[in-house]
Amino acid sequence: MSNQHMLLLFNLLPVGSNISTWWNFGSMLLTCLALQTMTGFFLAIHYTANINLAFSSIVHITRDVPYGWMMQNLHAIGASMFFICIYIHIARGLYYGSFLNKNVWLSGTTLLIILMATAFFGYVLPWGQMSFWAATVITNLLTAVPYIGTELTNWLWGGFSINDPTLTRFFALHFILPFTIISMSSIHIMLLHTEGSSNPLGTNSDIDKIPFHPYHSHKDMLMLTIMMTALFIIMSFMPNIFNDPENFSKANPLVTPQHIKPEWYFLFAYGILRSIPNKLGGTVALVLSVTILMTMPFTHTSHFRSMTFRPLMQFMFWTLVATFITITWAATKPVEPPFTTIGQATAILYFTFFIMNPLLGWLENKISITNM
């Protein structure tokens, strides 16, 4: 589309008329990013990146700073909203074959990895018990890297244990990475607009397009309003619903929490990590749990783009959704039967989806050719 920039200027960007509510999550993610950047800035003004003062500075923000409690809660709950939206956004991409737009999909997966790193660094900053021990467990995984693992870990820590230099660099990274996310998001959107969105049918939208404004812009506003309403209801009535009780105690390296676990949005990866009773194997599986998404454009064998007309693949997709929820739940439980068995079974099921994707595509092609 040669005159696309002129159309964008006049807000007449042509969009497929049949894209559903599942296509609204991109704009919701953009809103989450703006919200996190703003609240994060106001929190950073009052935060102190020192192991003796970090916990107290969070208490100071929530108690003494005007509207500090609101900034802190919005930032914490906003992170959960961000991940809810991004997981739905990815699920939409998997279901409707958006991954066939390779550049958009690969830039999106890179964005997810940067976002997860940013959220992890942010979780360490309050320097509560769970912050400290989650950081200890996750950064320790670097020691599983052959030959250079220990050196890598000490380099990341800035010493021989998690200490003040670790917190300082995690704060610096947590501050700088969102700007990388903003840059990558711009690239992601630019790449999307070179080819345009897919649609529920998985067909070419060129024959039936409508202006983005007012049609899709109003649809986006509805979902944004629902999301912001949900955010403020949670903030007002149950602000600590996503928090871990352990994190209300200051970090103590001498006392280990009974059950170390990260934030809920990392639990699926954490569940896969601990389902393998080997440090290196678990670390590889943890990395693969996210990076395996990058294989999707290269393993698609079906003649159909979308899963709308692929019942076998639909079954696999909804199994993946159930598996994701089950791993998340199992990872909150102690490392004992039956939770270990459930974790191992669901970890196998999770990767089965990506293995079955090319096989089922090939099988469906065979069936459709036979029936013609």
From Swiss-Prot:
Keyword Mitochondrion attached: yes
Residues engaged in binding a ubiquinone: H193
Cellular compartment(s): Mitochondrion inner membrane
InterPro entries per the UniProt record, alphabetical: Cyt_b/b6_C, Cyt_b/b6_C_sf, Cyt_b/b6_N, Cytb/b6-like_sf, Cytochrome_b, Cytochrome_b_C_euk/bac, Cytochrome_b_N_euk/bac, Di-haem_cyt_TM
Entry GO MF terms: metal ion binding; ubiquinol-cytochrome-c reductase activity
Any one cellular-component term (Gene Ontology): mitochondrial inner membrane
Cofactor field: heme b
Co-factor remark: Binds 2 heme b groups non-covalently.
Binding locations of heme b b562: H75, H174
Pfam families: Cytochrom_B_C, Cytochrome_B
PROSITE patterns: CYTB_CTER, CYTB_NTER
Transmembrane segments: 25-45, 69-90, 105-125, 170-190, 218-238, 280-300, 312-332, 339-358
Cystine connections: none
Protein residues bound to heme b b566: H89, H188
Main localization (coarse): mitochondrion
Family classification: Belongs to the cytochrome b family.
Quaternary state and interactors: The cytochrome bc1 complex contains 3 respiratory subunits (MT-CYB, CYC1 and UQCRFS1), 2 core proteins (UQCRC1 and UQCRC2) and probably 6 low-molecular weight proteins.
Protein name: Cytochrome b
Gene behind this protein: MT-CYB
